[in-house]
From Swiss-Prot:
Belongs to the secretoglobin family. UGRP subfamily. InterPro entries: Secretoglobin_3A. Pfam families: SCGB3A. The lineage of its organism: Eukaryota, Metazoa, Chordata, Craniata, Vertebrata. It comes from the Eukaryota. One of its GO terms (cellular component) is extracellular region. Highly expressed in lung and trachea. Detected throughout the airway epithelium in lung, with slightly higher expression in large airways. Found in lung submucosal gland acinus where it localizes to serous-like cells. Probably expressed in club cells of the bronchioles. Not detected in other tissues tested. Its main location: secreted. It is found in: Secreted. This is Secretoglobin family 3A member 2.
């Protein structure tokens, strides 16, 4: 049950992170050229996934290690979804 809760929270965080990245890249070109914003410097500190995991007291390294163990025990359909999640989390380590 805890694993399902963590999986759902991580999935929601990844979706919100993707939505944030999508919206930031939609700045119109003339505005972007007139007033360049230092968003690249701010966003690493405001990473919602890292913030959520840190708030829950979960280390990313332990989560990645646990997901790798889960991938070895799952069936082919479920393992593909967990592999994608593991790939996304491994960028945070």
């Amino acid at each position: 049950m805890k694993l399902v809760t963590i999986f759902l929270l991580v999935t929601i965080s990844l979706c919100s992170y993707s939505a944030t990245a999508f919206l930031i890249n939609k700045v119109p070109l003339p505005v972007d050229k007139l007033a360049p914003l230092p968003l690249d410097n701010i966003l690493p500190f405001m990473d919602p996934l890292k913030l959520l995991l840190k708030t829950l007291g979960i280390s990313v390294e332990h989560l990645v290690e646990g997901l790798r163990k889960c991938v070895n025990e799952l069936g082919p359909e479920a393992s593909e979804a967990v592999k994608k999640l593991l790939e996304a989390l491994s960028h945070l380590v």
